[in-house]
């Protein structure tokens, strides 16, 4: 489902959070899954996305997809798509952001690499969230519901 005209579903915003797949590297931990943890599908679950989901207002509908475990939906039932990532995930993260934006979704970029260099994401995301989510995600959610999300949210305090 693509977004409604006002950007939200009638029963509350639907948010899809995506953890992009890791390229084959040390950070993909495929070696650990083969050698140390046979039968397991992931070593490092996306706990940052679980934190974002917990910070959303209770009437929001949140789904988390870890692309290292399952495929991302091409036409999700969502009003907003958030794609987070680390530096090693940059290529796939920006690919996903650009795709979902091109097909009509509002997209938000976040994660540790976004926090280090938010300017790299300005061209592929409607909103860039730089910094610790605990400080800025609730404000983004309020602004999104009012139909006035900013292009950049930067956390200025410390955790």
Region spans (language model):
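Non-catalytic N-terminal targeting/anchoring module and adjacent flexible stem/linker
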Residues: 1-10
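A short, charged/proline- and glycine-enriched loop
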Residues: 9-13, 77
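Short glycine-rich His-centered loop
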Residues: 13-41
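Short, charged N-terminal beta->alpha structural module
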Residues: 32-58
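Glycine-rich beta-alpha loop elements in corrinoid/cobalamin-binding modules
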Residues: 48-159
């Amino acid at each position: 489902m693509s977004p409604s005209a006002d950007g939200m579903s009638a029963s509350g915003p639907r948010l899809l959070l995506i953890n992009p797949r890791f390229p084959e590297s040390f950070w993909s931990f495929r070696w650990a899954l083969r050698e140390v943890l046979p039968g397991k599908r992931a070593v490092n679950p996306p706990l940052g996305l679980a934190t974002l989901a917990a910070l959303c207002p209770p009437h929001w509908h949140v789904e988390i997809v870890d692309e290292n475990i399952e495929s991302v939906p091409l036409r999700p039932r969502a009003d907003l798509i958030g794609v987070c990532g680390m530096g090693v995930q940059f290529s796939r993260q920006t690919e996903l952001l650009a795709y979902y934006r091109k097909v009509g979704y509002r997209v938000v970029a976040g994660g540790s690499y976004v926090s280090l260099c938010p300017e790299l994401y300005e061209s592929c995301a409607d909103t860039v969230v730089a910094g610790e989510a605990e400080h800025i995600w609730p404000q983004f959610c309020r602004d999104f519901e009012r139909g006035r999300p900013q292009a950049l949210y930067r956390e200025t305090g410390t955790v």
